[in-house]
Amino acid sequence: MALVSPIPAMGERAGSMRFHGIGSPGSRSSRSGIMDEPVSRLIDEKIFVAVDKHVAKSKSTLIWALQNTGGKKICLIHVHQPSQMIPLMGAKFPVGAVKEEEVRVFREKEREKVHMILDDYLRICQQRGVRAEKMFIEMESIENGIVQLISELGIRKLVMGAAADRHYSRRMTDLKSRKAIFVRREAPTLCQIWFTCKGYLIHTREATMDDTESEYASPRPSISASDLLQTFSTPESEHQHISRVQSTDSVQQLVSNGSSTEQSGRVSDGSLNTDEEERESDGSEVTGSATVMSSGHSSPSSFPDGVDDSFNVKIRKATSEAHSSKQEAFAETLRRQKAEKNALDAIRRAKQSESAYSEELKRRKDTEIAVAKEKERFITIKNEQEVIMEELQSAMAQKAMLESQIAKSDGTMEKLNQKLDIAVKLLQKLRDEREELQTERDRALREAEELRSHAETSTLQLPQYFTDFSFSEIEEATNHFDSTLKIGEGGYGSIYVGLLRHTQVAIKMLNPNSSQGPVEYQQEVDVLSKMRHPNIITLIGACPEGWSLVYEYLPGGSLEDRLTCKDNSPPLSWQNRVRIATEICAALVFLHSNKAHSLVHGDLKPANILLDSNLVSKLSDFGTCSLLHPNGSKSVRTDVTGTVAYLDPEASSSGELTPKSDVYSFGIILLRLLTGRPALRISNEVKYALDNGTLNDLLDPLAGDWPFVQAEQLARLALRCCETVSENRPDLGTEVWRVLEPMRASSGGSSSFHLGRNEHRIAPPYFICPIFQEVMQDPHVAADGFTYEAEAIRAWLDSEHDTSPMTNVKLSHTSLIANHALRSAIQEWLQHHL
């Protein structure tokens, strides 16, 4: 164990480090004499404070001690635990595996850090006008080190922490720290200890004295303050020891007046060793002597004349010299403290200067590189200028030639002006025809809407399932549920990709043991068998025997996978994200406004939005959806489920799902499309960014360069959708759609510059005839709700088929309805893309 005093010897830091103790001896000329201050008084004048290596953890303990010292001096004590692993070449090695020199250098650095930490504590004391000194030892156990310091130094008053500040509470009445409990139990009982936490006194262990500690508590009257002088050294070994110099009395001389019947006192010489540093320089020991009269049986008159006066003079002289030595020792302590502080400051300034010099060299090198690049750039520009001058001369020659051609072109331009007048008249005529066509188109759209409502009504007549598949077909399609064909798994069950009746499909195997399994199975069949929409997943059939649902296969994965770039999938561009948001909005409007069976999805999130090969989005997972009341206002449920981050807080508390619940989830999805960040607390982050004008920093850089105006418009629209009160959320069909549809149209036009030629010409899937697999020219809606090319569906019906080509379910009738709206959209797409 090594004890380090508050005044290190500056000249010996590099070798065997030596530090002076609390009380330093005086100068060499005044070391003989009696120091009349007892040990107990020196110890009682100080309050010892145990501090941690982290200033923040012990600052409150030190401040409490400063406020309750009563003007007494503070002594900071610290137990340093040497590291058993030495960092070397980017790694850490045990002490035994490293050279002794490297271990010694590392230990020196550790001690310098400890000094700097204790200096921070000293500055706190200095700011409050309290004198303080520092001391630390090196031990593997902190609590044993504190107890040993109390025993070795005879500490009477100690302040230390009862527990970490985070454990403090008003009800705290006992110690929480293992170290504090150990010190309270093992420390000498005559030491009074205050235990504090977060600036409050938690427990006080009062000092008591028993017979075993009487010698420790009451030093001999002959032991003066000089007995407290200590020599603290830093040994070469890892475990350190503290040494203390004690004064001893020996009988030296018998003084008598010549009478054989009278006794006289004896004179004893006490020798006090100075520190080892002075012994090495002098080669001899410095001793101090004092004369003490014993209380014999002889009377004062038995001494020779003048003996009392001579003794009194010597005692006064020794006392004066001891007092002077004490003052000089204190002055020397202050000087050494100041010298140590100045040396540490000089070292820090030197390191700062060295760092600044290195940075300046680096900046200079960077500047030289930049200058060299600028020179190369200047030469390149000069060469380009010469080339441009040559081209300019050539252009001047061409200009003269063109001027002659212009004169010839004037006559031609006159003729063209005449043709232009004719073209303007023709254009005006075409505009008139266009207005008439637009009027006819609007009328056709209204008729198509009416026909669509009739088609929706007809879908109610469909049977419960599209196609019944046998369990053997499901097993064959999934290769007996081969794990390599599994593409998804959750509490609902597993999803496999397979080939069923020569068609690639996705097969969801619901878990029949789940309490919600049969309910979700029946719910999805009832919902998806009665509706068709381009942005809602198509249910092809079911297998009641195996609780299986057969869907169309969408190879693009989920929107969640694409937002997180799962399996290194390419990120979605901002144009695709705007289009996907528009498609989801259209699907939700369809669900909410379907007069025959309006419903709320209830679990809208990116994981339930699937993408096909053309990144067309489709809603899925209708197992937890809820049918609305006939008035379309709400659906009362007591088991509202869903992902917390996307769940409407109002619906979660009331148990009532409304269309506004899907609006809230849609708003969170909009924010994720904008930022690419997790859904939890995303609305707060976007609102903060909008308020502080930092929205551009929050946008997902993987989506490309967002148009800031459109991005801000989307962000504010999404925040409105995420309002806590449902009445404040916008309507999807009137407000949200009017923002998204124009934005999709504008982004689609501008995005063609970035798309490849082949990708740009891919038709949307709802333009493709399910039979011919080509873009439809004359789309018609059949009784099964699907749209086909008129020629294809008529050929199907003429071949004596009375079932649906898609679902194999018997058709309720064979009438066909022309889909004018889809035909108009296909023609418009063909004009722009072919």
UniProtKB/Swiss-Prot annotation:
GO terms for molecular function: ATP binding; protein serine kinase activity; protein serine/threonine kinase activity; ubiquitin-protein transferase activity. Residues 334-462 form a coiled coil. The active site is at 603 (proton acceptor). Its EC number is 2.3.2.27, 2.7.11.-. It catalyses: L-seryl-[protein] + ATP = O-phospho-L-seryl-[protein] + ADP + H(+); L-threonyl-[protein] + ATP = O-phospho-L-threonyl-[protein] + ADP + H(+); S-ubiquitinyl-[E2 ubiquitin-conjugating enzyme]-L-cysteine + [acceptor protein]-L-lysine = [E2 ubiquitin-conjugating enzyme]-L-cysteine + N(6)-ubiquitinyl-[acceptor protein]-L-lysine. GO terms for biological process: protein ubiquitination. Pfam families: Pkinase, U-box. It is an enzyme of class 2 (transferase). Residues 243-273, 284-293 have a biased composition (Polar residues). Functions as an E3 ubiquitin ligase. PANTHER family: OS02G0152300 PROTEIN (PTHR45647), U-BOX DOMAIN-CONTAINING PROTEIN 33 (PTHR45647:SF100). This is U-box domain-containing protein 33. It comes from Arabidopsis thaliana. The gene is PUB33.
